[in-house]
Design a protein with these regions (language model features):
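Hydrophobic alpha-helical segments
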Residues: 1-150
């Protein structure tokens, strides 16, 4: 299933497969998060990329930029994600989500109440939970892949 979704089988899944319960649980969680009814696939992939850029995980940066491209995110957006605040490629709602993703992807976490106040201007409570879920999922993957050297 993951191969058909991503176009390849990630090394992280190969290592997780050594613990079938972990692999099954992770796959269910990732499927739920990527199947959000409140966020479009472009935004999910941009949040994943921003969070991975912020954490410094090169493996996840490569895979999330590939995922964004496969989801149809414009090459211009992918190229300008580090300059999203000044770029006219991103909507105000995308900028609010990316503000949180870049801040929450840091260690220690740099998210603030102001991030959530701005998100409230653009998203429902359910969508905000889904934004945080994407960031948290990639927090796990960033640590997993950097630790195992995927």
């Amino acid at each position: 299933m993951i191969e058909s979704f991503m176009g390849y089988l990630p090394n992280s899944h190969l290592s997780m497969a050594k613990n079938p319960n972990l692999n099954e649980g992770f796959s269910a969680l990732a499927g739920t998060i990527f199947g959000s009814k409140h966020l479009n696939m472009d935004l999910i992939n941009l949040i994943a990329l921003a969070s991975s850029l912020s954490s410094g995980c090169k493996y996840c940066q490569a895979h999330t930029s590939h995922g964004a491209n496969r989801a149809g995110v414009s090459p211009g957006k992918i190229a300008e994600i580090l300059k999203y605040e000044e770029s006219d490629q991103f909507s105000l709602s995308e900028k609010a989500a990316l503000d949180l993703a870049f801040s929450a992807g840091l260690t220690p976490n740099a998210s603030k109440k102001e991030h959530f106040a701005e998100l409230q201007n653009h998203y429902s409570d359910e969508a905000i939970i889904d934004i945080v879920a994407v960031i948290a999922l990639f927090g796990f993957l960033n640590r997993w892949n950097d630790t195992l050297g995927s």
